[in-house]
UniProtKB/Swiss-Prot annotation:
InterPro entries: C4_dicarb_transport, Na-dicarboxylate_symporter, Na-dicarboxylate_symporter_CS, Na:dicarbo_symporter_sf. The keyword Glycosyltransferase does not apply. This is C4-dicarboxylate transport protein. It comes from Salmonella paratyphi A (strain AKU_12601). The lineage of its organism: Bacteria, Pseudomonadati, Pseudomonadota, Gammaproteobacteria, Enterobacterales. Keywords: Cell inner membrane, Cell membrane, Membrane, Symport, Transmembrane, Transmembrane helix, Transport.
Length: 435
């Protein structure tokens, strides 16, 4: 029993995070030097994301009986994303107004270091609906894979899957090759995941070593408020959605606990994307649904980031005594409904969108971003964890709505009545290429 515990990724990552925190706290200079370990692990994951998405989406779509089902899945997913992310934005707005973590700070924006946020403000200017939509279309297929742009790869994979489906039996050979390639890719993922404890250790040691636990104290009220809000959102909102769908949010969290720990260590929900694709299929969701919902959710369904954006914006207003009446807050909400949809699931992207939102609203001092620049890294863990759980729940919900969910398998896996294989298995749904 003890041997199996020590060998489990869950235990190894948890131990690595604890050691990283201790190293960063007692030997901050050494801890800060551990950054390459975390960066290397995240880069290895990013290396594999594009081919994973391509294989999963292509085999999922090409193996479907009807192309109408793909369109229905996409429409249902986008509707769900819009509803739930809007709820997340509103909850963040309500709680930050009730708790008022920035009240009484009386910060003069003129005294803040505007240069510290100049880089984020410059990147924020490039954000926009048209620019975002145009960026979804890759300049070249190779460029999409080389840059690792999730939405660009997803677009090409969807088109490729449609075209392969139309070939019918003539495309069987191509389908089999991609299916076999998918198995190889997931084999690589299993190898990379053995390095997860090292990556989590390096990232956590760097965070504590560079920023220090002391930086949490001054703005601790905002951090605590944000973490509690994320927990409430997961337990109450996502928990209610899960219960209505027919499963327990707590059992689901236990099922993806290893992925959550990887995200906790790296502060990026993207680091768990490949494993989530595999695990959601093993949970009973059809491969075509998983392939569409998970990658798309990384830009359109980031619940934790949505909560963070409203809370951070209003916090800056409270701290700098910038009055925000109901009209200003509704305007903020509307702007965030648009700007938050272009967020990628990588560390730092939420801060860039926050800068874009504050610039667009015009009522808040952009220099106020300097207030939370130092603690943004500590809040990114809660953002990433909430994003991951939110996308997992979304996949199950959408799969049920479009009737592509194996309820018995879902119940068996979450209740440990069926063994969860260690290696990736190609879904039986994708074994039938329609003529």
């Amino acid at each position: 029993m003890k041997t199996s515990l020590f060998k489990s990724l869950y235990f190894q990552v948890l131990t690595a995070i604890a050691i990283g925190i201790l190293l960063g706290h007692y030997y901050p200079e050494l801890g800060a030097q551990m950054k390459p370990l975390g960066d290397a692990f995240v880069k290895l994951i990013k290396m594999i994301i594009a081919p994973v998405i391509f294989c999963t989406v292509v085999t999922g779509i090409a193996g479907m009986e009807s192309m109408k089902a793909v369109g229905r899945t996409g429409a249902v997913a986008l509707l769900y994303f819009e509803i739930v992310s809007t709820i997340a934005l509103i909850i963040g707005l309500i709680i930050v107004n009730v708790v008022q973590p920035g009240a009484g700070m009386n910060v003069d924006p003129a005294t803040l270091d505007a240069q510290a946020v100049a880089v984020y403000a410059a990147q924020a200017k490039e954000q926009g609906i048209i620019a975002f939509l145009m960026d979804v279309i890759p300049g070249s297929v190779i460029g999409a894979f080389a840059s690792g742009n999730i939405l660009q790869v997803l677009l090409f994979a969807v088109l490729f899957g449609f075209a392969l489906h139309r070939l019918g039996s003539k495309g069987q050979l191509i389908f089999n090759v991609i299916e076999s390639f998918s198995q190889v890719i997931f084999g690589i993922i299993n190898m990379i995941m053995r390095l997860a404890p090292i990556g989590a250790f390096g990232a956590m040691a760097f965070t504590i070593g560079k920023y220090g636990v002391g930086s949490l104290v001054q703005l601790g009220q905002l951090i605590i408020c944000f973490y509690i809000t994320c927990i409430l959102f997961v337990v109450v909102v996502l928990g209610t959605i899960a219960r209505v769908t027919g499963f327990s949010i707590f059992k689901f969290i236990r099922y993806i606990r290893e992925e959550l720990l990887i995200v906790l260590g790296t502060s990026s929900s993207e680091s768990a994307l490949p494993r989530m694709l595999d695990k959601m299929e093993k949970l009973g969701c059809r491969k075509s649904v998983v392939g569409l919902v998970i990658p798309t959710g990384y830009s359109f369904n980031l619940d934790g980031t949505s909560i963070y954006l409203t809370m951070a914006a209003v916090f800056i207003a409270q701290a700098t005594n910038s009055h925000m009446d109901i009209f200003h807050q509704i305007t903020l909400l509307v702007v965030l409904l648009l700007s938050s949809k272009g967020v990628a699931g990588v560390t730092g992207s939420g801060f860039i969108v926050l800068a874009a939102t504050i610039s667009a609203v015009g009522h808040l001092p952009v220099a106020g971003l300097a207030l939370i620049l130092g603690i943004d890294r500590f809040m990114s863990e809660a953002r990433a964890l909430t994003n991951l759980v939110g996308n997992g729940v979304a996949t199950v919900v959408v799969a049920k709505w479009v009737k592509e969910l194996d309820h018995q398998k879902l119940d068996d896996v979450l209740n440990n009545r069926a063994p969860d294989g260690k290696t990736h298995e190609i879904s039986s749904y994708s074994r039938h290429l329609c003529p």
